[in-house]
Structure formats: C-alpha cells, structure tokens
Swiss-Prot record:
The keyword Ribonucleoprotein applies. Gene3D superfamilies: Ribosomal protein L17. The gene is rplQ. It holds the Pfam family Ribosomal_L17. GO terms for biological process: translation. This is Large ribosomal subunit protein bL17. It comes from the Bacteria. Keywords: Ribonucleoprotein, Ribosomal protein. GO terms for cellular component: cytosolic large ribosomal subunit. Part of the 50S ribosomal subunit. Contacts protein L32. GO terms for molecular function: structural constituent of ribosome. Transmembrane segments: none annotated.
Length: 131
C-alpha cells in the first residue's frame, strides 16, 4: 500500500515548503527555465503542471485559483494569455527535468527545469535586435 507517500518534506516546515515552491513556480513561469536540486524539481512539477492546466481554460474561477496559488497578478496574466494557449493541445507533461550534474559544495544532484515548447533564445534575441 502506498498510504502516506504523498510528497517530499525537503527538510522544511510546511509553511516554508509552500513558500519555497510558490517562489520557484513564479520563477519558472517568469524565466521558463530554472536550475535547482533534483528533489525540488520533482516536487515543483507537482505544483506547476496543475497551474498550467488551469491556464488552458480562462474563466474567473480558474484565475482566482491561480492567484491563490501564485499570489502574483502578473504571473496569472501570463499564465492565461501566453502559457494556456501555448499548451492548449498538449494533455499534460508541460515540464522537462534534465539532470545537470552535482553541486560543488555538497554534491547535491542538480536539475534543469524548463517548460516544453518554449521559444528558443536565438529567436527572442533576433526579435529584440529588430526592434
């Protein structure tokens, strides 16, 4: 039986863990790629993927739920105007977790978390140069 195997504690209290995952999800929504430890990346996936699924259907109730989870209006706007339409046809699996070696100080396994189908950096740089 798998009772009680819900989530990783990550050596934090529940409020600290909630705040950390909220900050990490906001950073991921802003930059679309972040570097963190592997266990944090796996927990982050359980927070961000339902958020993007909320963003696929734009209504007031979903916007309020997303605001309750991110506490930032700018990210809610980006979630429903950019990310929701981008992943409208994809049935889940919005994040890619790539193993990224080990941290020098404590040898912790690191991971690169990125949104799938994100615009390439070269395309964004080319558009910025034209403007």
């Amino acid at each position: 039986m798998r009772h009680g195997n819900g989530l990783r504690k990550l050596n934090r209290t529940s409020s600290h863990r909630l705040a950390m995952l909220r900050n990490m999800s906001n950073s991921l929504l802003e930059h679309e790629v972040i570097k963190t430890t592997l266990p944090k990346a796996k927990e982050l996936r359980m927070v961000v993927e339902p958020l993007i699924t909320l963003g696929k259907k734009d209504n007031l109730a979903n916007r309020r739920l997303a605001f309750n989870r991110t506490r930032d209006r700018d990210f809610v706007t980006k979630l429903f105007t950019e990310l929701g339409p981008r992943y409208a046809t994809r049935p889940g699996g919005y994040l890619r977790i790539l193993k990224f070696g080990f941290r020098h100080g404590d040898n912790a396994p690191m991971a690169l978390v990125e949104l799938v189908d994100r615009p390439e950096v070269e395309e964004t740089a080319a558009v910025a140069e034209e403007a």
